[in-house]
Amino acid sequence: MQNFGKVAVLMGGFSSEREISLDSGTAILNALKSKGIDAYAFDPKETPLSELKERGFQTAFNILHGTYGEDGAVQGALELLGIPYTGSGVAASAIGMDKYRCKLIWQALGLPVPEFAVLYDDTDFDAVEEKLGLPMFVKPAAEGSSVGVVKVKEKGRLKSVYEELKHLQGEIIAERFIGGGEYSCPVLNGKGLPGIHIIPATEFYDYEAKYNRDDTIYQCPSEDLTEAEESLMRELAVRGAQAIGAEGCVRVDFLKDTDGKLYLLEINTLPGMTGHSLVPKSAAVTGVGFADLCIEILKAAHVG
């Protein structure tokens, strides 16, 4: 096996997704140790990143979700320290965390995305409601794990929802509702993995459904995707990742409308690795267990 040296599993951090990061990090740490890797937990909230060098770490497995962890900040710090790290680089991480600018890139390349509008204080909210229709989804551009996602159903409520959310990270986006189904497709080192059909017990796949409930249904392989649709989803996921320069292990979320058309919703350049997480479920279908998945991700650690 490749010699990774002393490995820091970066977990925890400062974002609203800290607890999820700690859960993912603990699972990864145990998996790496089971494979004989000299791995240790490292929480930047407790210990400055500069101590990575001082403590002799040679590789970083980054599982810091959210702000500072997957937005290019920690990636830039690791570049300066010269420590190889897993996942996407600075630019791809920043773009992937910014749903608005990621959508602009996908649109420019002809990839299908749901119609959307960016909201500001002086937006004509009635016009946006008329354009996108109801219901619609409203979300902050730079939060993860569905933090701050609201489904707006009543006419005239868009402005009040915007006021509730505008303190969150990034622009606030209103997005056309696509009925039909929610899916996710991982990409591992440039290769699309089996798509997952997500059937939440809640109204949509929110934070509660992702992390706190055991009645969300995950179908992998998906029972309602044709072979052609599955192939197209993998192709679009790979193209979506390549469009922003994403590397390593990423996950692209999709919506499918009632006519069967697929839409790219967003990309997660640092997907979760908890018991509820989607990437391990998809990898398992291909015969790759959790520990081996962690090793494959670690193999792609890089600087620059």
From Swiss-Prot:
Mg(2+) 1 binds at residues 253, 266. This is D-alanine--D-alanine ligase. It comes from Neisseria gonorrhoeae (strain ATCC 700825 / FA 1090). Mg(2+) 2 binds at residues 266, 268. Keywords: ATP-binding, Cell shape, Cell wall biogenesis/degradation, Cytoplasm, Ligase, Magnesium, Manganese, Metal-binding, Nucleotide-binding, Peptidoglycan synthesis. Pathway: Cell wall biogenesis; peptidoglycan biosynthesis. GO terms for cellular component: cytoplasm. It is found in: Cytoplasm. ATP binds at residues 129-184. It comes from the Bacteria. Coiled coil: none annotated. Residues 103-299 form the ATP-grasp domain. Its EC number is 6.3.2.4. Belongs to the D-alanine--D-alanine ligase family. Its main location: cytoplasm. Its cofactor is Mg(2+); Mn(2+). GO terms for biological process: cell wall organization; peptidoglycan biosynthetic process; regulation of cell shape. Binds 2 magnesium or manganese ions per subunit. It catalyses: 2 D-alanine + ATP = D-alanyl-D-alanine + ADP + phosphate + H(+).
